[in-house]
C-alpha cells in the first residue's frame, strides 16, 4: 500500500486499515475471565491489502478473519487474510485490479470473469465448518484454529446460487441453517435462491423466485413456519453497471415489498406485502403467534450508504439513523400492509440475541448504541460500525441498559456467551472489541449481562489496533 488518502472519511479513525496478520499467545488480561467462557470469538473485517481505487467503499476491503481463542482463563489471538481468488490476483499484481463496488465492468481486463467476492462480512459456523462470507459470492472455508483458507465452499456442490447471504439463520430446535442468495444468477439479476441445510450439511430444501424489482438485500427473518424477505428500493441495474456507474440507486418511489414464504414452500407460494420506502440492514429476531408474525429489526428511513438517489437529493445522515423497530404481519388480514412500531429513538445497530431462544418471543437483544447523552469519539462514516455504548434491550421494560465505552473509545458488534448451557435467556456475558482511539490500539472487553453498567469483569489487551469489524460469532468448545 504505497499511498493512502488519510483525508478519506472511510480510511480514518476506527476505519483506518491495519493489514496485520498476527499470532499472539496468552494475551494480557485485566480482571478475571469467567470460567464458563471457553471457545472462540470469530470476527471478519474488510481490510484493503492494496491502495483502493478512487471509487471505493469500506465494505469492499479484503476479508481479514480474526479469532480470540479462550481456554481455561487464557486467550490467544490470531488474524489471517481470507485468501480469495480476488485477494490472490491483487497480491500478485501489487495493485488494485477491481474497480467500483460490485461492478465488474470497471475491472482490469486481466481479471475478467474472476470471482469478485472478498468474503469480508461475517464468520459463520455450521456442521463443523467455519466460513467467511460476503453476500456477493459463495463462502470461503477457514481452518477453525489457524484461520488458513481452505477454499471456496458450495456445500459439496449442492448450492448452485452464485451468492450467499452473510446472515443465515440457525434454528436451535432442529439444527438447520437457512439462507438465501440474492442476485443469485449474477450481478444485477432479480433472482433469489433459498436453501435449508440440515445439521449434517445436507441441503434438504431449495427454491427460487424473483424479487419485485432487482435490489440489494442483506438480511432476512425466519419463524418456525415462515421465512420473510424484505425487498427495499436500493435497486440494482445492469445498464448502470455497463455504463460504469454505481450498482445501486435509492429509488424511494418504488416503495418496499416484504415477501412471506412458507419455510419449506416453493417460490410460487410467496406472498408480497407492501411498505413505504425504508431500509433494514439487520434483524434481531422473529416469532409467530397464531396467524401473526412479529419481527424486531433495525429500521432507517433511507439506505445508510450514500449511493445515488433517483430524485437527485443529497445524502441526509439524519434519515439514515437505524432504530429498533417491530413489524407485525397479520397473515389472516386481506390488507397487504404491515404494522410498524418504533421501540426506541436511539441510534442502534449490529444486533444479536441469545440464539438459544431464537424463533420465540425473546426478552433481550444486544447491540451497539450511540447514547446521545454521551460524547462520540467516532465520525459519521464510522457510525454503522462503531458505537459509544453497548446496549441490552429489555422487551419487558421497553428500554436499554447501557454501558458507555469511554470518551476516546468506540465499541463494535458484541457476541453473547451464556453463563452455562442451561442458563436463563440473556444470562451470561457480552464480548466486544473496543477501539482505544487515543492509544491507537484495541481491547476485548467482557461484560456481565446481569450488571452491564458496572463495566468489564475482564479486559483483554491488544498491543495494536483492530480495524472496525462487521460481523462475527461465538463458537463454544465441543
UniProtKB/Swiss-Prot annotation:
Annotated EC: 1.13.11.88
Biotechnology: This enzyme may be useful to construct bacterial strains producing vanillin economically from the abundant natural product isoeugenol.
pH dependence: Optimum pH is 9.0.
Residues that, per the record, bind Fe cation: 167, 218, 282, 471
Keyword Cytoplasm: no
Temperature note: Optimum temperature is 30 degrees Celsius. Activity is lost above 40 degrees Celsius.
Cofactor note: 1 Fe(2+) ion per subunit.
Any one GO molecular-function label of the UniProt entry: metal ion binding
Activity regulation description: Inhibited by Co(2+), Ni(2+) and Zn(2+), which may inhibit enzyme activity by replacing iron in the catalytic residues. Inhibited by incubation with high concentrations of the iron chelators 1,10-phenanthroline and Tiron. However, iron is not completely removed by the chelators, suggesting that iron is tightly bound to the enzyme.
GO biological process, one term: carotene catabolic process
InterPro entries: Carotenoid_Oase, Quinoprotein_ADH-like_sf
Superkingdom of this protein's organism: Bacteria
Effect noted on mutating residue 218 to A: Loss of activity
The keyword Transferase belongs to this UniProt entry's keyword annotation: no
Result for mutant: residue 282 to A: Loss of activity
Keyword set, alphabetical order: Iron, Metal-binding, Monooxygenase, Oxidoreductase
Cofactor(s) this protein requires: Fe(2+)
Catalytic activity: (E)-isoeugenol + O2 = vanillin + acetaldehyde
Induction (UniProt): Induced by eugenol and isoeugenol.
The protein's role, per its UniProt record: Involved in isoeugenol degradation. Catalyzes the oxidative cleavage of the side chain double-bond of isoeugenol to form vanillin and acetaldehyde.
Family: Belongs to the carotenoid oxygenase family.
Protein's UniProt name: Isoeugenol monooxygenase
Amino acid at each position: 500500500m504505497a499511498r493512502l488518502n488519510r483525508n478519506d472519511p472511510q480510511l480514518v479513525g476506527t476505519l483506518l486499515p491495519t493489514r496485520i496478520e498476527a499470532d499472539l499467545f496468552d494475551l494480557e488480561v485485566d480482571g478475571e475471565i469467567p470460567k464458563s467462557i471457553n471457545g472462540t470469538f470469530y470476527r471478519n473485517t474488510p481490510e484493503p491489502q492494496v491502495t483502493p481505487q478512487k471509487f471505493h467503499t469500506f465494505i469492499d476491503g479484503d476479508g481479514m478473519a480474526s479469532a480470540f481463542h479462550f481456554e481455561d482463563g487464557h486467550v490467544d489471538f490470531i488474524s489471517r487474510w481470507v485468501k480469495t481468488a480476488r485477494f490472490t490476483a491483487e497480491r500478485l499484481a501489487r495493485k488494485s485490479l477491481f474497480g467500483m463496488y460490485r461492478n465488474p465492468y470497471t475491472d482490469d481486463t486481466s481479471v475478467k470473469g474472476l470471482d469478485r467476492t472478498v468474503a469480508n462480512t461475517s464468520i459463520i459456523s455450521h456442521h463443523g465448518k467455519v466460513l467467511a462470507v460476503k453476500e456477493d459470492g459463495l463462502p470461503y472455508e477457514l481452518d477453525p484454529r489457524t484461520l488458513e483458507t481452505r477454499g471456496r465452499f458450495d456445500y459439496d456442490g449442492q448450492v448452485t446460487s452464485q451468492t450467499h447471504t452473510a446472515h443465515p439463520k440457525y434454528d436451535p430446535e432442529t439444527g438447520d441453517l437457512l439462507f438465501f442468495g440474492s442476485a443469485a444468477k449474477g450481478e444485477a439479476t432479480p433472482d433469489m435462491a433459498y436453501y435449508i441445510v440440515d445439521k449434517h450439511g445436507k441441503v434438504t430444501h431449495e427454491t427460487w423466485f424473483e424479487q419485485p424489482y432487482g435490489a440489494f438485500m442483506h438480511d432476512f427473518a425466519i419463524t418456525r413456519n415462515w421465512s420473510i424477505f424484505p425487498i427495499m428500493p436500493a435497486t440494482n441495474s445492469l445498464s448502470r453497471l455497463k455504463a460504469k456507474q454505481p450498482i445501486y440507486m435509492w429509488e424511494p418511489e418504488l416503495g418496499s415489498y416484504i415477501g412471506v414464504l412458507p419455510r419449506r414452500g416453493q417460490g410460487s407460494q410467496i406472498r408480497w406485502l407492501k411498505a413505504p420506502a425504508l431500509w433494514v440492514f439487520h434483524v434481531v429476531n422473529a416469532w409467530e403467534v397464531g396467524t401473526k408474525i412479529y419481527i424486531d429489526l433495525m429500521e432507517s428511513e433511507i439506505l445508510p450508504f450514500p449511493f445515488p438517489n433517483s430524485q437527485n437529493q443529497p445524502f441526509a445522515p439524519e434519515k439514515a439513523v437505524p432504530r429498533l423497530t417491530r413489524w407485525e404481519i397479520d397473515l389472516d388480514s386481506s390488507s397487504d400492509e404491515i404494522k410498524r412500531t418504533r421501540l426506541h429513538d436511539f441510534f442502534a445497530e449490529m444486533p444479536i440475541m441469545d440464539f438459544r431462544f431464537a424463533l420465540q418471543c425473546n426478552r433481550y437483544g444486544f447491540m451497539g448504541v450511540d447514547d446521545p447523552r454521551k460524547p462520540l469519539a467516532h465520525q459519521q462514516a464510522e457510525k454503522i460500525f462503531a458505537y459509544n455504548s453497548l446496549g441490552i434491550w429489555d422487551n419487558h421494560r421497553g428500554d436499554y441498559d447501557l454501558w458507555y465505552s469511554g470518551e476516546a473509545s468506540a465499541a463494535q458488534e458484541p457476541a453473547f456467551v451464556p453463563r452455562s448451557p442451561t442458563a436463563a435467556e440473556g444470562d451470561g456475558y457480552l464480548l466486544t472489541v473496543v477501539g482505544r482511539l487515543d492509544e491507537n490500539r484495541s481491547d476485548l472487553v467482557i461484560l456481565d449481562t446481569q450488571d452491564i453498567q458496572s463495566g468489564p469483569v475482564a479486559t483483554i489487551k491488544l498491543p495494536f489496533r483492530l480495524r472496525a469489524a462487521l460481523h462475527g460469532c461465538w463458537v463454544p468448545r465441543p
